[in-house]
Amino acid sequence: MVAIQQNLKSEDRRIDVNSIFSLDRIGNSSTVESGQSLTIGTEYLKSRKINNEEENEYPTDVLELSLATVFRDEINESMPTTSSLGSKSSDVVGHIGLSPNNFFSSNYNFSLDNNLDVLKYNSLDAKFTVNNFITSFKYLEENDNIGDENYIENNTSFKFNENSSIGFSVRKNKKIDLTEFYDLIYQYKNDCLTAAIKYKKDFYVDGDLKPTEQLFFSLTIVPLGAFESANVIPK
């Protein structure tokens, strides 16, 4: 039995082009949307024709463009504020995906208000792959009812061989112009064992600008289980 709609106003339910057409787009299986709404969207997809020899070398979809929005006959104040689904005209959400070759790919997701003059959500990520070297960047900006996060992040990894790799992650908070953290990990992995050395540095936690550092070791043996050491850097 499905209950009548609950008050979900305070729930965090940002919509995008993937979720806006879902029957469970409000993210609560115990309730349904009340009232009437119309969801419309458009999609453009450019694909590459490839032969069997190229099947694993190049991405099939080169360019993706998507736009969608929701119209409602009456305002529904019980809908999540971050989703804008309770308004007569919701935000316009969109996606642009670009994969011209097997070295580079990029995705851009955004939300514009219904007047198309306020960019509420702005997320851009790009990935570069050259042999065993992979680096990716992500930029996120939230405004208005969606949130207030704003950061840029990088994740980089390099595989020395089939078993050994090193990875690095760093994030900078653009709102306060401070680096949040950086992580460094060296990992060895085979069929039955994974061993890693991890270094983590947080530059601030919950408003405290005092940096914290951690260095620890982890070991996983199949099927015996996993072990992780305590922080070996004195506080």
Question: Can you name each region flagged by the protein language model?
Answer:
Residues M1-K235:
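Outer-membrane beta-barrel translocator/pore domains, especially the C-terminal barrels
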